């Protein structure tokens, strides 16, 4: 990772799904469930939990992701991941903060 490149943390959209799925498969030992993690499954998840899932993006490329949802009382983080070459730069921390802020706003 270049130190001069900025990482944008923003809400995940379905347009990100392909890159997010590729990131999941890139990470050794990352568990993917065929039903929940399918395009249709993630689309349902994002509709139930708008604004709480985030991506980290560098130059249009997804380098991190958190799927985050809630049931009205309890928030839960799923699939917290950062691409191996981008770790130890605070990206995960920034994504967690963004998702927590969305949960606190009652998203």
Predicted regions and their residues:
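Helix-loop element at the rim of GNAT/NAT acetyltransferase active sites that forms part
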Residues: 11, 21-35, 45
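Conserved beta-strand in the GNAT
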Residues: 55, 61-69, 76-81
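Short, intrinsically disordered, charge-balanced linker/junction segments flanking boundaries
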Residues: 63, 101-107
């Amino acid at each position: 990772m270049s130190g001069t490149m900025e990482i944008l943390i923003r809400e995940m959209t379905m347009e990100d799904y392909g890159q997010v799925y590729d990131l999941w498969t890139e990470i050794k030992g990352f568990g993917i469930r065929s039903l929940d993690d399918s395009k249709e499954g993630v689309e349902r998840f994002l509709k139930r939990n708008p604004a709480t899932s985030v991506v980290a993006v560098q130059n249009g490329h997804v380098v991190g992701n958190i799927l985050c949802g809630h049931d009205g009382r309890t928030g839960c983080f799923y699939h917290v991941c950062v691409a191996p070459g981008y770790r130890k730069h605070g990206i995960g921390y920034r994504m967690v903060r963004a998702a927590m802020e969305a949960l606190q706003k009652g998203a």
